[in-house]
Swiss-Prot record:
Gene3D superfamilies: HesB-like domain. Iron-sulfur cluster binds at residues 45, 109, 111. This is Putative iron-sulfur cluster insertion protein ErpA. Signal peptide: none annotated. Homodimer. NCBIfam families: iron-sulfur cluster assembly accessory protein (TIGR00049), PRK13623.1 (NF010147). Binds 1 iron-sulfur cluster per subunit. One of its GO terms (molecular function) is iron ion binding. Keywords: Iron, Iron-sulfur, Metal-binding. Pfam families: Fe-S_biosyn (PF01521). PROSITE patterns: HESB. Its cofactor is iron-sulfur cluster.
Amino acid sequence: MNAVTEEIPSPLIFTDNAARKVKELIDEEGSPDLKLRVFVSGGGCSGFQYGFTFEETINEDDTTVDKDGVTLLIDPMSLQYLVGAEIDYQDSLQGSQFVIRNPNATTTCGCGSSFSA
């Protein structure tokens, strides 16, 4: 019998730059069990805002995205707003930050961390 394995496509894009920066931050903390949680909450000037936090625990209903040895966690409520989005890390003259490019956002704020859907 031949087993067929089907790889499930990732619900969002976690770029190499973002994964590299997350790994660097985890290494600085000296806690290899840390994972980066990205979430959406109410607030900001456009209705919703993005947030990032490090956690060790994966919740039962979390979606995980693994890249280059690091794990991104997304809760179900946030996932509905982040499907198809790209999580990136940019280092520029304006500063260094994680950036979310979200095709579901109908408007975004100038700060880049607030949006409406």
